[in-house]
Amino acid sequence: MAVFHDEVEIEDFQYDEDSETYFYPCPCGDNFAITKEDLENGEDVATCPSCSLIIKVIYDKDQFMCGETVPAPSTNKELVKC
């Protein structure tokens, strides 16, 4: 069983469209990373390439199965329908 450093909502990650990768700052100074493809495949663990820490990504798996990108948080409370 993995020991997670933290559990982080996908909305708190930064998304890079070019690499289709979500990033979140790691305490070591690098970034945790998880690709959109990983999320579409049901993965929920983001790793840091510079240290041994891992975090659990909290996200709606159904939304990623529809091939959608989760936008940054906004004030719009309207639900997205698949």
From Swiss-Prot:
Keyword Iron: yes
Ranges of residues in domain DPH-type MB: 4-60
Chain residues that bind Fe cation: 26, 28, 48, 51
UniProt KW keywords: Cytoplasm, Iron, Metal-binding, Nucleus
Gene3D superfamilies the record matches: DPH Zinc finger
GO terms of biological process kind: negative regulation of protein secretion; positive regulation of binding; protein histidyl modification to diphthamide; tRNA wobble base 5-methoxycarbonylmethyl-2-thiouridinylation
Chief subcellular location: cytoplasm
Expression tissues: Widely expressed with highest levels in heart, liver, kidney and testis.
Gene Ontology molecular-function annotations: electron transfer activity; ferrous iron binding; iron chaperone activity
Catalyses which reaction(s): [3Fe-4S](1+)-[protein] + Fe(2+)-[Dph3] = [3Fe-4S](0)-[protein] + Fe(3+)-[Dph3]; 2 [3Fe-4S](0)-[protein] + 2 Fe(2+)-[Dph3] + NADH = 2 [4Fe-4S](1+)-[protein] + 2 [Dph3] + NAD(+) + H(+)
Pathway(s) annotated for this protein in UniProt: Protein modification; peptidyl-diphthamide biosynthesis
Gene Ontology CC annotation, any one: protein-containing complex
Required cofactor(s): Fe(2+)
Source domain of life: Eukaryota
Effect of loss of the gene: Embryonic lethal about 11.5 days after fertilization. Decreases metastasis in a mouse model of melanoma.
Localization (cell): Cytoplasm; Nucleus
UniProt comment concerning the protein's domains: The DPH-type metal-binding (MB) domain can also bind zinc. However, iron is the physiological binding partner as zinc binding impairs the protein electron donor function.
Quaternary structure and partners: Component of the 2-(3-amino-3-carboxypropyl)histidine synthase complex composed of DPH1, DPH2, DPH3 and a NADH-dependent reductase. Interacts with SERGEF.
Family statement drawn from the similarity comment of this UniProt entry: Belongs to the DPH3 family.
Function of the molecule: Required for the first step of diphthamide biosynthesis, a post-translational modification of histidine which occurs in elongation factor 2. DPH1 and DPH2 transfer a 3-amino-3-carboxypropyl (ACP) group from S-adenosyl-L-methionine (SAM) to a histidine residue, the reaction is assisted by a reduction system comprising DPH3 and a NADH-dependent reductase. Acts as an electron donor to reduce the Fe-S cluster in DPH1-DPH2 keeping the [4Fe-4S] clusters in the active and reduced state.
UniProt name for this protein: Diphthamide biosynthesis protein 3
Organism: Mus musculus
